[in-house]
């Protein structure tokens, strides 16, 4: 599936670059205002897949979201209140995240969308399933670019048999190292960014 939507490719690639670069900053999020008309908020995720996948608690609570993901979203959003209030409302807010950060970004977008902030878009890379069908219905009209790279195993968690779903269709990125069949290594955010650059170039 190619990338369809209203966001220019420069915005999408800048968001993915921020998702890659947020890790060395050792902070919960990274804000970029480099592209006119857009503010990008990249939420920190994790490149270490085994630790948190193993320890996931799969029970969906009454708010139809994974408890750990929702707690992380609330904590991150609380840190963003001051920064978000200072943003220009005429600029589109692009919320992005990789891995756990993708699930967190989805739930932050849900919180903002439900509170009437509709001038937003969502970009996720290698995100696990963030919640159930009620969440999917709530944000079905939200513009969302959901990238999956190669054989990344993280988007297959938590299990759909436990009630978890993805909220939007996938945009498949070819393996940046096409001789590799490693579902853990394919989760690397640097490879996501490189594959997205190639994806856009191939679809020009």
Please name every model-derived segment:
Residues 1-96, 100-204:
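Non-catalytic, mobile gating and regulatory segments of ester bond hydrolases
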